[in-house]
A protein has these predicted regions:
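Bacterial Sec-dependent N-terminal signal peptides
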Residues: 1-24
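Beta-lactamase-like hydrolase cores
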Residues: 18-60, 81, 86, 121, ...
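Conserved serine DD-peptidase/penicillin-binding transpeptidase domain
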Residues: 28, 78-338, 455-456
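Short, ordered coil/turn segments that flank beta-strands lining enzyme active or ligand-binding pockets
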Residues: 47, 189, 421
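Residue-level preference for non-acidic, small/hydrophobic
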Residues: 49, 66-75, 143, 174, ...
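Small-residue-rich helix-loop
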Residues: 52-54, 272, 290, 305, ...
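Short active-site loop at a secondary-structure junction
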Residues: 54-70, 74, 78, 299
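A generic structural motif
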Residues: 59, 110-112, 434-436
Length: 456
């Protein structure tokens, strides 16, 4: 009799634990900050792909920058981790007595990393040195950058307030300095106008209308407005008061023209005169080539630093014109349901993107087995990378968390891997859309949910 009593007691405890697990986890999505939100959650064990927890896992929601997990993983799948881009430079005509009777011609290879702050390349200075070593003192023709007129289209679902700011830099055949320029502003007392100290690099043909004022707020709340063909860009908003120099970054919509101006300036400093008398279309000789970092290195910064430009480059690598179609085909090819996907860009900036949490988690389970460190190393690390500081503040999480964040107005998203106390590795995706509470509280709720997962 005593045996049966103990048996029934143990059975009740086990059943109680099993029944409570989803109920306990569900309570996180019933808190005040989540009351009006649309929430999708998917958690699976990477070892066998079995479901650990689901909550609206099939609901299509805005992923923000979590979309980069698709761009990076599929680029690695299709192109391998060692692919590189090549930029070639030629001179046309003949060099006689220091005079180049022709042009300098740059053949872009789609490299998104030329003189990027994320890599040490020195493309501009190395090209200038190569021209000088040829003994050129004068260039009769021009500097020609091929495909310069191929202006990329802005996705129609990008917000107007984003388009002129650095994180909306478009991917071009020729890219330079992350297609970003920096406006340094000086501020005075709160409420007073600011002034432009410098623009680096200078942007030919574009004027700035500065309407930014000084503020007691200690944050960057200044925005740039204007499309790619605008001759005048407006700057509005506020920056902290009493700053001698405060940086506001904009999207460089015509990187080829900016680079040409920089190259001409540097050549002049070296005593090389660009005469621009005529374009001489003759045979050309390659004299300088730049190879980009490996694809896995570009993927690393795409996810670690959430670089939209790099993500758009990877999207073009996957498919120059049909990224969404290719994503669906590749996911279906590896057995992942793609029916709930809507994709309007490759970086996650579009407010029209929609993904089911379950689809992204399935991709993570697949990537863990097939892509290895080239993909896994690109994910932000808890306790190390600044983007995860809220999520990994808990000691239970910390280094046990590797995940990509996503955020835009009304959206908080997180997707990656979690190592549990049991020694298991879980792949998870959490999308929270249209919340009305404090975004930090939303992130803290996600953190507490992950903590509960980790200790069960």
């Amino acid at each position: 009799m005593r045996f049966w009593g103990i048996f029934i007691f143990v059975l009740l405890i086990l059943n109680r634990g099993i029944a409570q697990t989803p109920e306990v986890l569900h309570t996180f999505w019933q808190q005040k900050e989540m009351k009006h939100a649309a929430i999708g959650v998917s958690v699976k064990n990477v070892a066998d792909g079995k479901v650990v927890y689901e909550y609206n896992a099939g609901m299509s929601l805005r992923p923000a920058s979590v979309l980069k997990l698709l761009s990076t993983s599929l680029a690695l799948k299709l192109k391998g981790d060692s692919l590189t881009f090549h930029t070639k430079v030629f001179y046309s005509g003949k060099i006689r007595d220091g005079l180049l009777q022709g042009n300098i011609v740059i053949e872009p290879g789609g490299d998104p990393c030329l003189d990027s702050k994320y890599f040490k390349g020195n493309f501009l200075s190395r090209l200038v040195d190569s021209i000088v070593r040829l003994g050129i003192k004068q260039i009769e023709g021009n500097i020609i950058i091929e495909n310069e007129g191929q202006q990329p289209l802005i996705p129609g679902s990008w917000l107007w307030e984003d388009v002129a700011n650095y994180y909306a830099a478009l991917y071009h055949p020729f890219n330079y300095r992350d297609n970003t320029y920096t406006i340094n502003l000086a501020s005075g007392k709160p409420g007073t106008s600011t002034r432009v100290v410098s623009v680096i690099p200078s942007v030919p043909g574009v004027k700035l209308r500065n309407e930014v004022v000084s503020s007691v707020k200690q944050q960057d709340d200044a925005w740039i407005y204007g499309g790619p063909e605008a001759s005048t860009l407006s700057m509005r908003g506020t920056i902290p008061a009493n700053r001698s120099s405060f940086a506001v970054k904009g999207a460089m919509h015509h990187p080829a023209s900016v680079f040409r101006a920089e190259l001409e300036k540097e050549l002049k400093n070296k005593g090389v005169v660009l005469k621009k008398e005529k374009d001489i279309l003759t045979d050309r000789q390659e004299f300088f080539t730049v190879e980009s970092p490996l694809l896995k290195e570009i993927v690393f910064y795409t996810n670690k630093n959430s670089v939209n430009l790099f993500a758009e480059a990877l999207g073009a690598l996957v498919s120059p014109s049909e990224f969404e179609t290719m994503v669906k085909e590749e996911l279906n090819h590896v057995g992942i349901d793609s029916s709930g996907i809507t994709i309007k860009d490759a970086c996650g900036l579009s407010t029209s993107n929609a993904l089911p949490a379950g689809t992204v988690t399935d991709l993570l389970v697949w990537a863990n087995k097939h892509l290895g460190d080239s993909f896994l190393a690109s994910l932000p690390q808890g306790g190390v990378d600044r983007g995860l500081r809220v999520y990994s503040a808990d000691s239970v999480l910390g280094a046990n968390l590797k995940a990509k964040t996503g955020s835009m107005f009304g959206v908080r998203a997180l997707s990656g891997y979690l190592h549990t106390r049991k020694g298991e590795t879980l792949a998870f995706t959490i999308f929270v859309n249209s919340y009305t509470g404090d975004p930090v509280k939303v992130q803290e709720t996600i953190r507490d949910f992950l903590r509960e997962l980790a200790i069960q």
